[in-house]
Structures are given as C-alpha cells and as structure tokens.
Regions:
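Catalytic pocket of metal/acid-base enzymes, prominently hydrolases
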Residues: 1-13, 17, 21-28, 123-144, ...
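Residues forming well-ordered secondary-structure scaffolds
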Residues: 26-29, 60, 163, 167, ...
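Residue-level detector of conserved catalytic or cofactor/ligand-binding positions
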Residues: 207-214
C-alpha cells in the first residue's frame, strides 16, 4: 500500500520534478527564476512550457484545459477550453500556446467585484500563477490563476495574497541588505495554524484569581 501511495503521489501535478525532467535546460532555468525570484516570464519561455505541459497533460488523458481561480464567491471557478482546433480539411490538431497558458478572459460580470467597477466594465482577466503547480483532474488540465479586472483591481482571493507576498519580499530584502545579505527574493509561507496548551487545572484557577484581583 505504501509503495502504491508513493507511486501516485503528485503523479498528476506539473511540479518542479516534472518540469526539470521534460523542459529544455535553458527554459527550466528561466522558469526557475520566475518561480523562486519573481523574475518576469518571457513569452518564448511560456510557449515552450505550454507545449510541454500540453503533451504531459494529454498523456494523462486531458482533452481540455481550464484557468482555475478563486473569485469572491467563496468557491473555485473554471473556464474550460479544448486543445482541439479544427482545420480546413475536416481534421483537427491539438494546440495550446503560451498566450493561452498565461492569460484567459472570463466574463467578470458573473462574479462579485465589491463595487470596484461599473456593471458595464465586464471584462476580466485570469493570469497564470507559475508559483502554483498545474494539475490534471477529471481529464482537464487545471492551471492556477489570479483573477483581476481589466484595470487591474483584484477580483479574487489569490491576487491580494500574491501582492502581499511580493511587498513583504521587497521590504525584507531591504532589511537583509542592511545586514550585508545580498538576496534576490524572500519566500513566505502561510497557512492555518491552531495551537493548544495543556496546563494544570489548579494553575488555571490560580491565574483567574490573580486576574480578578484589583
């Protein structure tokens, strides 16, 4: 059973292990800078990543892809498109470009905006977040994305987090440089945490007595 778990764990995730194994060395190194240092993503790199990601997903049975995002509804949303592109002679080819990987355009009027924009400004964009690994689920390649309005306002729960992490990195780098540390990027990790402390009942009751005293 344990061996089976190890075989299937992460088997449908386009993680760094898969990237390093399948991407050309130069492409992987460039993408690695984006992942770990926040470097801008070159469109040529995105084209190569998209092609490799499509082949990997198709090997796992995927026929469609979706930009997967978290709008202000409290649940995830998806906009599905197919890899299949019909051609003039009645056949079809499988396509997936860097542009399609990097950006999508769902109808933002279907989602809450907190009054950030007029109802006529319905256009919204999904933008690939390469720091969250793509994965295959139910024969669909799911690409984690941020969701913003056409003027750049956050329409989801991920964009404020990514912007906060970037701001924290910039300020942490300033502090570290004061201490002589030359770094390019500071990674932050967040997650729910709950701690419980066990103390003796008599100590708890004693603390209540002290608190109640004037």
């Amino acid at each position: 059973m344990a061996a089976n778990v190890m075989e299937i764990y992460g088997s449908k995730v386009f993680n760094e292990h898969v990237m390093k194994e399948r991407l050309p060395s130069a492409t992987y190194k460039s993408l690695e800078k984006t992942l770990h240092k926040g470097a801008p993503l070159d469109i040529e790199v995105a084209n190569v990543v998209a092609s490799v990601m499509k082949r990997w997903a198709m090997e796992l049975g995927a026929t469609h892809y979706t930009h997967w995002f978290q709008p202000l509804t409290g649940i995830t949303s998806e906009k599905h498109d197919g890899f299949v592109s019909p051609v003039g002679d009645g056949t079809a080819i499988m396509e997936f470009s860097g542009k399609e990987l990097v950006r999508g355009e769902p109808d933002a009027s279907s989602f809450p905006s907190g009054g950030l924009r007029a109802t006529c400004e319905a256009r919204g964009y999904t933008a690939w977040d390469p720091t969250s690994f793509a994965f295959v689920k139910d024969d669909v390649l799911c690409i984690p994305t941020a969701f913003v309005s056409y003027t750049g306002e956050a329409l989801d729960k991920k964009t404020p987090l990514l912007r906060s992490m970037n701001a924290l990195s910039n300020q942490a780098i300033r502090v570290l440089k004061l201490f002589g540390k030359d770094v390019d990027y500071v990674s932050t990790t967040v997650g729910p945490e709950q701690e419980y402390f066990l103390i003796k009942k008599e100590d708890y009751e004693l603390s209540l007595i002290h608190i109640s005293e004037p």
